[in-house]
Structures are given as C-alpha cells and as structure tokens.
Amino acid sequence: MRSICWIALFLSLATFATAQTKIDSWNEFAKTKFEPKYYEKMGEYLFYPNFTKELKALEGKEITVQGFYVPFAPEDGDYIIISKFPMSQCYFCGGGGPESVAEINFSKTPGKFQVDDLITVKGKLKLNADDMEHVNFILDDAVLVSK
C-alpha cells in the first residue's frame, strides 16, 4: 500500500512538472511589442520587435506550435509559414500582425500542405529582430508532429 502511494505521488508530480513546461506559443509571441524604425534598404519604416524576457529565455529551446499553413513560395523553397489564424479569416487584413505568423524550417521535407491545413510542429525557437527577409518567430530543425 505504501509503495502505491509513493508511485501515485511521483506520477502526479511528474504530470504537474510537465504541465508547467508546456507553453502557449502564440500567446507568448503576442506579448512582443513592436516599434517603428527606419529600414534603410527599403527606404521606409518597419516594425521591429522588442521580445519579452520570457520569450528570450525560450530561444534555442524546443517548443511546439500549432497553426494553419499559409501558401507562401519563398525563392529557395526551404521553409513554410504557419499562422495562428486560417486564411479564411484573412489574418493579414487586420486580425493579426507579425506576432501571428511563424517560419518553419524543417529538418527533413514533410511533404505537401494545403491552404489552411492545421498542423503541429516542434522545433528550436529562433527570435529574429533584424532580418526583414524573414518573420520574427522561427522554428529551426522542425519536425511535423501532426497534420
């Protein structure tokens, strides 16, 4: 009986610890504040991110993000974009901003996706504040968890 109590205690603590490390990626991304700065290359003002301390602490760590596939054809074709919102909600028309999209660099090609496929990916978070050719939230070495 005593060993059953210890096992139950251990399992409940393990479950609690796992729950504590799970994050809502989109919610964390949404805490990012943006400020306009002049971007010389384009000759106009663009919004640059000020990442939170909590988000900076996640950089380089593996996170999971679930989002909708956005049809985007980069010239080199080695990454995809997912959004918190489906295209049918027109994420770029006002409901979402730069905090609602993530760039996914797969470790191996996962196959083809259709517009608004809801996918879950896992990868190492990279925060991008300066390269305007890419989005602010990037998952490197990503793998497809579910489609």
Label each region the model flagged.
Residues 19-147:
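OB-fold and OB-like single-stranded nucleic-acid-recognition modules
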Residues 4-14:
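Sec-dependent N-terminal signal peptides
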